Amino acid sequence: MTAKKRSASSTRWMQEHFDDHYVKLAQKRGLRSRAAFKLEELQEKDHLIKPGMTVVDLGAAPGGWSQVAVKLVGDRGKVIACDILPMDPIVGVDFLQGDFREDAVLNALLERVGDEKVDVVLSDMAPNMSGSDGVDQPRAMYLVELALDMCHQVLAPNGSFAVKVFQGEGFDEYMKAVREAFKVVKTRKPDSSRARSREVYLVATGYKL
């Protein structure tokens, strides 16, 4: 991508961002990102999170999904969040800053979880996009594979998993792996996802040990 193209692309993104209905609505409701509406839509359709549950939120910053999750689990529940980027504190959310790809960070996250299994694993992780599918897609697939591996380590029987996946090379194989691990897997494209984005969300329920 040339500097001129990149500049035009960035300008278009900024214009879309500021004109975006969901961005304005998020600001009005005090939500940290428009992504919060994606989780709200998934919750409305699939009822993933219930009061008293323990939820792990991967790729949490700036905190839109954690804000939604902590309200849903209530005082008796727990939300454990992780991101490579910093995140301002949210009451009721135990946040760990670090690169989830590193063993030390994974181990620290597992320590936060403790011996209790979790009910829901959420992943809105995405790599820094370079604009090259040949680079971006493998990076994105690596992250979602790590998220599925996290499910295998911490998820309770019949637990649930919601993960952002970019359609492209490796998607079908990943879908197969998720289907092998869960009883029911649905593909969702929330209304709040940008139409031109290749992102979809896999909502998997009924974790099979």
Swiss-Prot record:
A GO MF term: rRNA (uridine-2'-O-)-methyltransferase activity
Broad class of enzyme this protein falls into: transferase
GO cellular-component term (any): cytoplasm
UniProt catalytic activity: uridine(2552) in 23S rRNA + S-adenosyl-L-methionine = 2'-O-methyluridine(2552) in 23S rRNA + S-adenosyl-L-homocysteine + H(+)
Any Pfam family matching the protein: FtsJ
Keywords attached to this entry: Cytoplasm, Methyltransferase, rRNA processing, S-adenosyl-L-methionine, Transferase
Organism domain of life: Bacteria
Segment forming the signal sequence: none
Cellular compartment(s): Cytoplasm
EC numbers, comma separated: 2.1.1.166
Active site feature: K164
Binding annotation for S-adenosyl-L-methionine: G63, W65, D83, D99, D124
Major place of residence: cytoplasm
Family that this chain belongs to: Belongs to the class I-like SAM-binding methyltransferase superfamily. RNA methyltransferase RlmE family.
Function: Specifically methylates the uridine in position 2552 of 23S rRNA at the 2'-O position of the ribose in the fully assembled 50S ribosomal subunit.
Protein name, entry field: Ribosomal RNA large subunit methyltransferase E
Organism of derivation: Shewanella amazonensis (strain ATCC BAA-1098 / SB2B)
